[in-house]
């Protein structure tokens, strides 16, 4: 539900990089309708068959996803508005980082033209998403923001806002002093 509320902030030409929990037909169809590109890890329940579709390379092809049955949470009007099929690129990526073991990731993306993005570029997108998560984790731990102390949703928003203000104040002081973070 949170993703659906945030979709309105995405503009045509933006690229959404997300994890496998968001890789559903309805999400991808809505992103395509908005003109938003995407790179997502494939959901573990969806098995990819690289022998079908238009082959772009080894473990890299363009596939057609058929519209699944309507989920219980979706309104019939929204389901009827979805296209009958969507065209996606399915790629097996090797995400390699120094000091870490290489991870093999099956990704789904909207970049279906082979010259548009290479598998290495798609892998780079996904790795940057992972680094952002690690950076947020570092910030939360170093500033003692890793545990939220309030339970009310409105107060949680205020607490998160206070943490972000404190973080930005520390960063601005670092910039003013000329110190390297």
Task: Label every PLM stretch briefly.
Residues 1-181:
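Single, function-defining residue in the core of a domain
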